[in-house]
Amino acid sequence: TIHPVNPKYADVLGYPCHPSLEAIPGTVDCAAVLLGDKAILPTLKAAHARGVKGVWAFASGFAETGEQGAAMQREIRDFCRETGLLFCGPNCVGYANITDGVGMYSAPLPRAFRKGNIGVIAQSGAVLLALGNSPREAGFSRLISSGNEAALGLADYMDYLVDDPETAVIALFVETIRDPEGVADACRRARDAGKPVIALKVGRSELACRVAATHTGAIAGSDRTLDAFFRRWNVIQVNTLDELLETSILFSGLRGAPTTSRRVGMSTVSGGEMGMLADICSDYGLEFPPLSEEGKAGLRNVLPPYAPLANPLDAWGSGDLKEAYPASLSILAREPAVDLLIVSQDMPSNMADEQIAQFSDVAAAAVRARADSGKPVVVVSNISGGIAPSIRKILDDGGVPVLQGSTEGVGAVAAWLDWNRALAEETEAPLP
């Protein structure tokens, strides 16, 4: 039940409006405060007196504005510590529990929103909105905007997601780490729980540090120190929002036996794209083991005589997407030296119906290769901007992630391999 509170109105959007928190009948679980900066602390006090357990505030005007604002923020912090009131903000867009369809979030969510197992914590509200509205169609469980973190901070939200059964992947947009010990403990708990933490940390340049300070009052730490911090706790680092999404999507949906090697098989339908992807894979240190004689013999039986038998494999030559192409993918995936299969196939959402039908066969072949081999299979669409919904459903149902963008897709695969290797080694790199 929603209870608007404003002494100036009798109703708001059809809901009866109350003159004060005290006037609301029954229990109040949480409160969204849409007031100016100087009204936040008095409202928190009123909420606590009313028995409210959690509060979110949208207002800015605190530590990011200078000493006067910082002093107000410290008062909020001290009050919340003394009372145990859970406070999200200030200067943030709130949070959304996507799984259960509840929350206090200052923006509408897309109509076609994918529920999933990726929990996001962003210290920038605009970034959280961008991720939530992205056409890349990541499946989210929770969206959390932490803002200035006057009371609850990054470590608190991470602890929540580590314990959350609906969240399997934790994605972070970080401007600063205010509580290194708490965040380190949360990262360790995430690692022990088998939940990957993927972080985009800004502030490598002097300009970015200044922007962070004026945005949320954040003090960005040494880039070298933070790199070492993330390496120590096996946090996957990315550089762009697209990379953050694609890497999270891969970890969210990849099925098959984990591998610590970098030996991959790759199938393409284009010689040009094969060369492009080979360069990118080389940049990320991925290896293409040669085909076994048995593998070559199997491919020789399903591909035309002129088709080159190699890894990466150009399997388009047969033109037979119903039998020859699926068979060639399965043969490549079953190669003893191949631990993961990348299928390169562009699948933009605006394709003609005939192409959608054609490339649906490619998606089905990728699913069959995963089932036949028991190994992880990933589809990479080199063009971003959305995947044809019917094709996505085939891949989702078959446990095959589809990634958008060549660099983002290959980078996500490399990150998954690195993460598996670090877990197997169980090493903690020392801080500088």
Give the positions of each predicted feature.
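Catalytic-core regions of core metabolic enzymes
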Residues: T1-P432
